[in-house]
Amino acid sequence: MVLSDANKQEIHHVAELIKPHAEAVGADALARLFELHPQTKTYFPNFSGYHATDAPVKAHGAKVINAVLKAAEHLDDLPKHLEKLATKHGHELLVDPHNFVLFSDIIVVTLATKLPTFSPATHRAIDKFLEELVHQLSSKYR
């Protein structure tokens, strides 16, 4: 992954903006994923609902966004930082890796709706970051 210093600055700026709102951003993104790609609900059979206001959606959305925020702190060593998570997804959870692509696109849309300063440069930086994150999470699939 080639992230310029400007890209890294944009990523860190967005991370700081959304950190206090991780639960709301995550819940919104996850609810969008369920609405646009209902087949993804099969990975969450214990959820009683799939809306942003439902407690399980809030909790899992926060978990995902907090993991993304943590990854943003490790831009220079993403493969090492994400190795355990990639192994868990690739060998234990067995989530179709294409869902990472779907969810990363939805995260971008969610950020664009939440952040008035989401510029084309911000979009480019976040897109590059999430593309690498998806690549790393998919790296342990056989």
From Swiss-Prot:
Name recorded for this polypeptide: Hemoglobin subunit alpha
Gene (UniProt): HBA
Recorded family membership: Belongs to the globin family.
Function: Involved in oxygen transport from gills to the various peripheral tissues.
Ligand binding (heme b): 89
GO biological process: hydrogen peroxide catabolic process
GO CC entries: blood microparticle; haptoglobin-hemoglobin complex; hemoglobin complex
One family name in Pfam for this protein: Globin
The keyword Transport is annotated on this UniProt entry: yes
Organism, as annotated: Bathyraja eatonii
Cell cycle listed as a keyword: no
Keywords for the protein's UniProt record, in alphabetical order: Heme, Iron, Metal-binding, Oxygen transport, Transport
GO molecular function: haptoglobin binding; heme binding; metal ion binding; organic acid binding; oxygen binding; oxygen carrier activity; peroxidase activity
PANTHER family: HEMOGLOBIN FAMILY MEMBER
Binding-site positions, O2: 60
